[in-house]
UniProtKB/Swiss-Prot annotation:
Compartment list: Cell inner membrane
Protein's membrane topology: Lipid-anchor
UniProt protein name: Uncharacterized lipoprotein YgeQ
Residues with lipid group (S-diacylglycerol cysteine): 17
């Protein structure tokens, strides 16, 4: 998936690119946006770019009736404050507690059909890391932040993830080409699965492009920062295969030549 910062996911739920098309059997960002835009309830608007001489106007399909008159090309300071106030509840992170972990879902939907079609109700590594960064910036949320990070660490330490790392370390060619994206370390899972299994489609792991080294790099970066600050201690390191998974992930990224490997 492209553009999965917490801000981008928020905006994706409000408006989407009107030129996106679904391609092939694999679910992509284009097909997700196409599903959202096909509802028929969107308001079609055109906006001036900041540099109209160089860049043309851009088009947005706005799905939120609440915000359709609030999205503008330019804002005053008071308008920005008003927008922050209007979206205050929307921007709050909702944590999902399970016996096997604490999760930040990419998004939630009122109807199961949209959730099933987009899979934004799954747990995404990158989105959860952005959520963790928001939580850890507030001392009052430090306990919840650590729970989220440890849950992601446990996901990266599952037997399936460790096997993917070991397989690529042994044979980096497993990542060559487009059809082998499922061989990469996975970056998304079903929070309802006690073993943090893949999102399922017709009883099988859904085909997805998991080649997202930027998410893996952010994960390692934040993990190291948590160690440096003492947030993560020796007891945390010693649980299960956490230490093993970190060592394997570093070797995996090296064997995958992450610096030249294209992200999805």
């Amino acid at each position: 998936m492209k553009g999965k910062s917490a801000l981008t996911l928020l905006l994706a739920g409000i408006f989407s690119c009107g030129t996106c098309q679904a391609t092939g059997a694999e679910v992509t960002s284009e097909s997700v946006f196409n599903i959202l835009n096909s509802t028929g309830a969107a308001t079609d608007k055109s906006y001036l770019s900041l540099n109209p001489d160089k860049y043309p106007n851009y088009r947005l399909l706005i799905h939120s009736a609440k915000l359709q008159n609030e999205i503008k090309s330019h804002y005053t300071k008071d308008e920005i404050q008003g927008l922050l106030t209007l979206t205050e509840n929307t921007r709050k992170l909702t944590l999902t507690e399970k016996p096997w972990g604490t999760f930040i879902l990419a998004s939630t939907f009122e109807d199961d059909k949209t959730a099933a079609e987009t899979h934004y109700d799954a747990v995404w590594l990158r989105d959860s890391l952005w959520g963790y960064m928001a939580l850890v910036s507030d001392q009052g949320n430090s306990v919840a932040a650590k729970k989220v990070l440890l849950t992601l660490w446990d996901y990266m330490s599952t037997p399936d993830q460790i096997k993917r790392m070991q397989d690529v370390i042994s044979n980096p060619k497993r990542l060559d080409g487009i059809p082998v994206q499922m061989n990469a370390v996975h970056i998304r899972f079903d929070s309802n699965s006690p073993v943090m299994a893949d999102v399922q489609e017709e009883g099988k792991p859904q085909l997805w492009n998991h080649k997202q080294n930027d998410a893996l790099g952010l994960y390692l970066d934040l993990l190291i920062q948590a160690i440096n600050t003492g947030t993560i201690n020796a007891e945390d390191w010693q649980k299960g295969d956490r230490l093993k998974s970190v060592a394997l992930l570093i070797a995996y990224l090296d064997k995958a030549n992450f610096y030249v490997m294209e992200d999805s």
